[in-house]
Amino acid sequence: SDGIIRLARAAKKYGKVWVVAPDGQRSAMSHRITLHETIEFFPVDFPVEGVHAYASTGTPADCVRFGILNIVKEKPDYVFSGINYGYNSGTDIQYSATVGSALEAACAGVHAIAFSEGASECHEVTDAYLEQMLKELMEQPLAHNQIWNVNFPQCELEKLRGILYDRKIADCGFFIDEYLEEGLE
């Protein structure tokens, strides 16, 4: 997709880039992984020079997991997911394969950033700020199991009103074993 190409091109400035992505559209897959089916991964030509790329019949989370464990020779410093076509905010986050794959990276102990932009042909803000956001967010420490979730607005550059920073937590579980002893008597 155009978003993956633009993200890979920007990320190349900061190190080696490997792309492991589904072979087709996988919107609203959330954090789904494949358990009882065979998944194929195969090398593909990629339009950004120096980027190693693989496509997969699996989900975005499958791609992150397999990429970290089997394709990339050393554990990556970061996983970048996106650029998704459409915002991932509010309740949409729970359905997002873009955010889900970043959460999969966090569960594997790798810092991750999910990138999305408005569903329009206007990419002025993304194109102007993508490299800066990559640099700034990679320099800011993330706690274990946190990810950055970046949504670029679909407006012209002169209408941009500012940048809001947001972190999400992937605790790789559904609850925290922490109890209050009050009222247990």
Where are these regions (language model features)?
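A cross-family phosphate/adenosyl-ligand binding-site feature
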Residues: L7-N70, E74-K75
